[in-house]
A protein has these predicted regions:
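Acetyl-CoA-dependent GNAT
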Residues: 2, 9-82, 91-102, 155-163, ...
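Loop/turn elements at beta-strand to alpha-helix junctions within RNA-recognition modules
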Residues: 78, 112-115
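Conserved G/P- and acidic residue-centered "switch" motifs that form tight phosphate/ATP-binding loops
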Residues: 85
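Structural preference for long, well-ordered alpha-helical segments within the folded cores
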Residues: 89, 93, 120-124
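Short glycine/proline-centered loop/turn elements that form peptide/ligand docking sites
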Residues: 91, 115-118, 135-141
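Conserved GNAT acetyl-CoA-binding A-motif
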Residues: 98-110, 121
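Conserved catalytic-core motifs of GNAT/GCN5-like acyltransferases
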Residues: 108-110, 123, 128-151
């Protein structure tokens, strides 16, 4: 059985078993603490009945006007707990915070273009590709060898006309061409 609760700073001592695959981004401690301090409502942990961390989601709200949105910075589930809808439930919690607490227009996320399993999961949840970011997962913004990302979006209730999910006029963009906010 899995339960969900707010992520705490002590979870940073346990998350190594969750961040084990090459598709999961692992950030520095200060990055996680910054998110926990600024957007605690967007940081949720899943745990087993014996208290082991099985997954987490972290995100934030950003943008202004019609670009005000929730952003999924990371969602990951430890390999033994995958295919149990934990990631879906974590995503639903982030979407609920985005709608009920922030009243934002949409939720967005970036996913490796090669991560077909994650892309299918997001599509089943109502996310669609907004644009492709060329070389997003490189060592730096000027690295031509980086892997592409799909910027996927899902409109929230506030976006009654679904304008936020209409594909970008220029679908393929370099990281420095993106209007972030």
């Amino acid at each position: 059985m899995t339960s969900f609760r707010p992520f705490s700073s002590l979870d940073l001592l346990k998350y190594n078993l969750v961040n084990t695959d090459c598709l999961t981004e692992t950030y520095g401690l200060s990055f996680y603490l910054s998110y926990l301090a600024h957007w605690p409502e967007y940081f949720v942990a899943s745990e087993t009945i014996d208290g082991a961390l099985s997954g987490y989601i972290m995100g934030k709200s950003e943008g202004e006007g019609r670009l005000f949105h929730g952003h999924v910075t990371a969602v990951t589930v430890a390999p033994p707990f995958r295919r149990q809808n934990i990631a879906n439930k974590l995503m639903e919690k982030l979407e609920r915070v985005t709608e009920e607490f922030h009243d934002a227009y949409f939720v967005d996320l970036f996913v490796r273009a090669s991560n077909e399993n994650a892309i299918r999961m997001y599509e089943k949840m109502g996310y669609g590709p907004y644009r492709r970011v060329i070389g997003y997962y490189g060592n730096n913004a000027l690295d031509d060898g980086g892997e592409d990302a799909l910027d996927m979006r899902k409109a929230m209730r506030r976006d009654t006309k679904k304008r936020s999910v209409i594909k970008a006029k220029k679908f393929e963009q370099k990281p420095w061409e993106i209007e972030w906010h």
